[in-house]
C-alpha cells in the first residue's frame, strides 16, 4: 500500500495519485471513491462556500479520480493485461449515502453531492461496460470519521448517530470486497446499502405510472385532474433517511 496525503478534490491531485499507482504497481484494478466531508446547513441558511466545499470533496473528487483512472483501465482491457487471456477485471466503487437517495434536513449540499454520485456511477457503468469494468454505488451505515462529524440538532439525529457509532465498518468492507471479486463480474450500475449485517439493493428511478391524452388541446386543468386520479397514489413521501432507517441495525 502507498499513502497519498493530498486533498484529491482537484484534477491535478487525482492525476498524481493515478501516476503514483502506475509507477509502483504498473496498473490500476480497483478505484474506490470514499472522500467525504460534512458542512450541514439548511438550504435557506447554508453558505455558498460550504456548498462548494462539500460538492467538491464528495462529488467532484470522485469524478476527477474516475476521469484519471478510467483511460488506464480501458487500455488494460485492450492490452489484455494479466495472464494473457482477455482482461475482464476492473472495479469502481463509489461510496454514497442514503442522504443522497432519500434526503435529510440540513444536508442540501451533502445530499445533492451524493445524489450526483449516483448519476456518476450509472453513467460510468454504461460507458465502461465495453471494457468490462463495473461501477457500483454503496450507501453505508457505520461508524466513520464522517459520523464523528455529525452534531445532532435533535433527538432523532442523536439516536441515528448513536446507532451508527455501534456499527463496525468491516460490514461495509465485506460488501465492497464482494463487489471487487470475480463473483461480481456482471454486477454493475447497482445501488447497494449496507447496515451492519444487513445488505440491500435499492430500486432506481423508473416510471411507475403514466397519463396521456389524445386531445391536442390538453389544458393544465385537465392534466391536473389526470394527475390526481392516476399519478397521485404513486407519489413518493418526504421521509428522510433517518426516518426510513430508525430501527437498531443487526450488528
Model-derived features with residue positions:
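Active-site-adjacent segment of SDR/Rossmann-fold oxidoreductases
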Residues: 26, 102, 115-118, 123-134, ...
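Substrate-binding pocket helix/loop in short-chain dehydrogenase/reductase
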Residues: 42-43, 47-55, 89
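The beta1-alpha1 cofactor-binding region of Rossmann-like NAD(H)/NADP(H)-dependent oxidoreductases
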Residues: 5-16, 48
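A short, exposed helix-loop element centered on a Lys and neighboring polar residues
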Residues: 66-67, 122
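A glycine-rich helix->loop->beta "capping" turn
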Residues: 20-33, 39, 134
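C-terminal helical subdomain
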Residues: 158-251
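Residue(s) in the substrate-gating loop at a strand-loop-helix junction
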Residues: 97
Amino acid at each position: 500500500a502507498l499513502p497519498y496525503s493530498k486533498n484529491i478534490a482537484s484534477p491535478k491531485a487525482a492525476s498524481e495519485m493515478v501516476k503514483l499507482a502506475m509507477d509502483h504497481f504498473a496498473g490500476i484494478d480497483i478505484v474506490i471513491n470514499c472522500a467525504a466531508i460534512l458542512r450541514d446547513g439548511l438550504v435557506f441558511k447554508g453558505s455558498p462556500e460550504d456548498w462548494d466545499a462539500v460538492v467538491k470533496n464528495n462529488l467532484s473528487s470522485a469524478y476527477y479520480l474516475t476521469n484519471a483512472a478510467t483511460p488506464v483501465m480501458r487500455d488494460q482491457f485492450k492490452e489484455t493485461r494479466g495472464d494473457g487471456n482477455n482482461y475482464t477485471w476492473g472495479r469502481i466503487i463509489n461510496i454514497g449515502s442514503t442522504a443522497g437517495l432519500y434526503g435529510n434536513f440540513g444536508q442540501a449540499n451533502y445530499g445533492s453531492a451524493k445524489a450526483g454520485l449516483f448519476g456518476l456511477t450509472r453513467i460510468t457503468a454504461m460507458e465502461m461496460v465495453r471494457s468490462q469494468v463495473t461501477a457500483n454505488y454503496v450507501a453505508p451505515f457505520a461508524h466513520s470519521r464522517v459520523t464523528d462529524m455529525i452534531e445532532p440538532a435533535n433527538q432523532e439525529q442523536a439516536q441515528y448517530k448513536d446507532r451508527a457509532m455501534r456499527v463496525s465498518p468491516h460490514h461495509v468492507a465485506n460488501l465492497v470486497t464482494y463487489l471487487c471479486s470475480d463473483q461480481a463480474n456482471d454486477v454493475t450500475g447497482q445501488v447497494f446499502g449496507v447496515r451492519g449485517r444487513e445488505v440491500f439493493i435499492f430500486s432506481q428511478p423508473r416510471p411507475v405510472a403514466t397519463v396521456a391524452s389524445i386531445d391536442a388541446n390538453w389544458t393544465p386543468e385537465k392534466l391536473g385532474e389526470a394527475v390526481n386520479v392516476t399519478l397521485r397514489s404513486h407519489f413518493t413521501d418526504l421521509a428522510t433517511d433517518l426516518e426510513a432507517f430508525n430501527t437498531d441495525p443487526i450488528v
